[in-house]
């Protein structure tokens, strides 16, 4: 039976299972997939922090539903999605390589279609995702926004994990420890 960490995300209370990673570190696992009420709550709270941005970008997969809610709340008809593998429709897109995240443990790449890259060009871009921990995934998104010619306006996360809670360049709704 898993242990749990109880958290409060701006009034939304939930319990996160504590799970071990292969490197021996334990994390409080945050999963928005399939949880419509939590996604709506977190997306609306992040949207309050995103005022002034022209477009939202996220990385698949857990950020997708957040980006949808934030964009809807801001009245934006589109948001950009960085994919973790190159899709058929991305032949004329852009890509960046970045380091390993705490959950994958391996170097990765992010891909952006030409359509989504064009959405970012010259725009104030708000990066939205579920959790920031090591900052490697964020670095990949920042590099992608810069490569597309966007202007990084805000970096918003539901949770800041571990040392990420001390970063001054990001905003979060709650913090969790590395265990």
Question: Which sequence ranges carry the predicted segments?
Answer:
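Active-site-facing substrate-recognition patch
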Residues: 1-53
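PRPP-dependent phosphoribosyltransferase catalytic core
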Residues: 2-6, 139-179
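Short glycine-rich phosphate-binding loop at a beta-alpha junction
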Residues: 53-60
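Conserved acidic residues
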Residues: 54, 123, 153
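Gly/Ser/Thr-rich loops at beta-strand to alpha-helix junctions
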Residues: 60-66, 134
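Short Gly/Thr/Asp-enriched flexible loops that form oxyanion-binding sites at enzyme active sites
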Residues: 65-74, 141-142
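Short, hinge-like loop/turn segments at secondary-structure boundaries
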Residues: 74, 96-101, 171-174
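Short, glycine/charge-rich flexible loops or terminal/linker lids adjacent to PRPP-binding catalytic cores
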Residues: 78-125
